[in-house]
């Protein structure tokens, strides 16, 4: 299983958690179970990808309030709770990766989120997701630059 597939599974779990109130461990287990074949035997790479999916789900869910604040800040004219649930899950996962995952470049997090939006949401969602995430990144870099300027004084 690739990281892309792990993100798809994480998206399914986050969507289920948001809509049905399922706990993170159950949602991930159900997403992984749906994905497996009867003769499936996890190898090392597959277990690493499954763990990546678990980490994304737990992290995105744990930090959803922080992510929602960032999303709301840059989603002009949109309230997070009024967004399509799948878009909200994609954005939460991507913001979590951008803010908290040092092993994932911002550009990869955005590209993967855009691909998820193209696959699982509406025709306009990929542009919507791309625009919000780009603004989040620019806002964070601007804040980091301001912090550096203040600390040098």
Swiss-Prot record:
InterPro entries: NusB-like_sf (IPR035926), NusB_fam (IPR011605), NusB_RsmB_TIM44 (IPR006027). Keywords: RNA-binding, Transcription, Transcription antitermination, Transcription regulation. GO terms for biological process: DNA-templated transcription termination; transcription antitermination. The keyword Cell inner membrane does not apply. One of its GO terms (molecular function) is RNA binding. GO terms for cellular component: cytosol. Belongs to the NusB family. This is Transcription antitermination protein NusB. PANTHER family: ANTITERMINATION NUSB DOMAIN-CONTAINING PROTEIN, N UTILIZATION SUBSTANCE PROTEIN B-RELATED. Involved in transcription antitermination. Required for transcription of ribosomal RNA (rRNA) genes. Binds specifically to the boxA antiterminator sequence of the ribosomal RNA (rrn) operons. Pfam families: NusB (PF01029).
């Amino acid at each position: 299983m690739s990281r892309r597939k792990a993100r798809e599974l994480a998206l399914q779990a986050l969507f289920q958690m948001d809509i049905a109130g399922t706990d993170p461990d159950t949602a991930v287990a159900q997403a992984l179970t749906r994905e497996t074949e009867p003769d499936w035997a996890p190898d090392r790479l597959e277990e690493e990808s499954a763990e990546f999916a678990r980490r994304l789900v737990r992290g995105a869910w744990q930090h959803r309030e922080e992510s929602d604040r960032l999303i709301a800040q840059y989603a002009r004219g949109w309230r997070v709770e009024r967004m399509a649930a799948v878009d909200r899950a994609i954005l939460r996962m991507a913001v979590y990766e951008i803010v908290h995952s040092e092993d994932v470049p911002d550009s990869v997090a955005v590209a993967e989120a855009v691909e998820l939006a193209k696959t699982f949401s509406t025709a306009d969602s990929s542009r919507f997701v791309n625009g919000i995430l780009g603004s989040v990144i620019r806002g964070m870099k601007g804040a980091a630059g301001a912090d550096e300027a203040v600390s040098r004084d």
